[in-house]
Amino acid sequence: MEEGGGDENGMEQHPPAVRGAFGEGNGVNVKDEVRLLSIGIVLAALLMLVCAGPAVSAEPKPVNREIPWDVSALSKPPKVYPATERPANGMRAFFYEGADYKGKPTWVFAYYATPGGTPPAGGWPAVVCAHGGGGTAYPNWVREWTKRGYAAIAMDLEGHLPGGKDHGMEGNLPLGAGHPNAGPARIDYFGDRALPDKEQWVYHAVADVIRANSLLRSLPEINPKKIGLTGISWGGTIVSTVAGVDSRFAFVIPVYGCGFIHESDNPGLAQWFPPKNMTANQFRDYRAKWDPAAHLPYAKMPMLWVTGVADPVFQVDIFAKSAKTAGGPSSMCLRPFLAHGHGNGWEDAGEIYTFADNIVKGGPPLPKLERPEINPATGIAHTKYKGDFTEAWVYFTTSGGQWQARKWNFIQCNVSEKELVARQRLPQGTTAFLIYGFRVGQGNQRSNHAASELVEIKP
């Protein structure tokens, strides 16, 4: 998408809602997450893949899955051990027991806190927080939830003790420090693919998240019916798998991360799969066990999928396909210029907390758009919706090829009580589009970001 007020077709190119650039912030470890990937600020549309009718893409095919985890054993409360190595103000630091690694139980470092005051009837709602690649347990992520009335646990999923000075870390201690009872560290994306299942990082990351749920459910101050899960980047991919394996969660919110990694046209992801990497058996195991695509059809809880329009790691096609594959209610939140990073992934999308409040506190729901359609006589895109919008736009592209390289343009919509209608027709050659809305409040604050399904138009 290029700067400017319009193109040769008279289409708007930068709606006021999306002017600007990516903000500064402490990102997910870019070396780990985006290796061999040249990151450009290129808008990409998002959302659920529309598959009805002859002109759009086909339904995702189901994948036969295998479950390498002993879910029954992981559903039992884990043992907890004291931790003095990495204190954080206002919260508990401890180890809890994870899955066995090479015949020995692992210990998982975690921060945990509850809101101040007396718990509500039934106990606090709670959230499990799964970090992304190169990340760790972050105190400020826990604090973001506790200030909103939730208990929260954030754990290190890479066999490390927390370190550094970002996101509430204290002491500026070394990054990536291990401990004697750690499980396996992550080896790039799939560098451990030749190892036995129970020695691979994804196996332990998923198990550690399930165990965190089991721990919360055992605490007397927690309401076991109101425990949610969220993950950022690679953590978003992990929680997308957990959603289909651990049915006890009340809601799941993947941020940036998703499934169908093997179908990505991002060179940094595609390099790990055949023909460059993985044997035929390893690829079969990956699809059946480790990719969220195998497990998402079994995820029946409400899910909110959150990303920016220019995410540099998980492109629109696989993100949208993941959302469509989920077996329960699946909603999408499109935040223009949501930078890919820890901090950004919990601070810059208030819809995360609106969604959680709706599920476990009875708060108002996020808006919901129906599948957009094109009037065959006029070429005008439109969709019905429920919710509170003051502004809406059609995002469309006439480009093909890699999603990262596609250019996107915009057409403003008229907002009526129940329908969003584009003010101009889509140009010939449109290859994909969606309709996106939000509410502008006092001080130009934008909220209620939501988008329709992504429609891919085949030639």
Each language-model region and where it sits:
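Short beta-strand/loop motif that positions the catalytic acidic residue
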Residues: A299, W305-T307
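Primarily recognizes the serine-hydrolase "nucleophile elbow" in alpha/beta-hydrolase
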Residues: I210-P275
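Catalytic cores of secreted or luminal carbohydrate-active enzymes
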Residues: P312, V316-N375, G387-D388
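Cap/lid segment of the alpha/beta-hydrolase catalytic domain
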Residues: R143-A207, C258-F273
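N-terminal cap/lid segment of alpha/beta-hydrolase-fold proteins
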Residues: S72-G122
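Gly/Ser-rich "nucleophile elbow"/oxyanion-hole loop immediately N-terminal to the catalytic nucleophile
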Residues: A121-G123, I187-I232
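Surface beta-strand/loop "capping" patches
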Residues: D357-F396, N409-E419, R423
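Short beta-strand element of the alpha/beta-hydrolase
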Residues: A121-G132
